Amino acid sequence: MKAYRQDFAAIAFLVTEGKPARLTVADITKDSMRHAFAAYARDHEAASIRRCWSTWNMLCTFLYTGEQLAANPMQLVGRPKLAKPLPKALPRTAVEALLETVAEDQDSKHRTDWAERDLALMLTGLLAGLRAEELQRADVGDIRTTDDGAAVIHVKGKGGKERSVPIEAELLSVIEAYLDSRAIRFPGTGKRTTNTAASPLSQWPARSALFVGRDGERITRGTLQSRIKRAFKRAGPDAQPVPGALVHGLRHTYATELAGSDVSVYTLMKLLGHESMTTSQRYVSAAGAETRSAAARNPIYAMIPTGGEAPAN
């Protein structure tokens, strides 16, 4: 209430030229409100101006409803837009702590713990920038290998918009190790093949869900959120999630790491699947190189141990 009283008093002071006690309904006009808020804006931040505007808008709405004002003048008084906060990324120490935490589940006897899958989930978010719903919708057939041992993930994004995100051999190895562990957990659910040398990707139907839960079915949003949340909780103070962006924080980290590698806004827009270059501009303003080489620069690749196994402490 104190803030509302201050907002009322500040504008009343400006409208009455320093004599707020003399304010009458007749003083509340479009012009007086515009001039008062213009003066108020010179010494206050956008958030304060918007709160003050809301205070006076409620008052004028009340007076208009009570037929004491012919119209609400605040509808003709502009208010500033709040700048969107810059996306926050996880520091590298947090990423390392998360990966180490997932590794601790390697020898767990609990069926809910699945280190290979959780590592693949986390690294796909960190190294391919997939949203939570994109991780859920991903199929095994969406990953297509290249001649040099790397791969491309074909992502089904927002509004049916698709994009292709290149990934390096290190991440592909992590995903393949997860698929191998999945075949052990759920025998008979993949393709029947006698070729033991075949890629783990080829041993699953193309339309089979890439990430599954403990029941072998496509992973749910709840399971995805809970596994990431659990990793953050167990990683301790060195790994705090991005406020309000548990899984999305992995995507923010992907974008921020690439931005720090001098990737162009256009390239980042393609990799993230943004509709507008303005959204990508929030991450980077420098010019860069082509998509594949840009994605390959992500420093998180250096945190993946060789062989696709989860990192050890």
Residue ranges and their predicted role:
Residues M1-N313:
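Conserved catalytic core of the tyrosine transesterase superfamily
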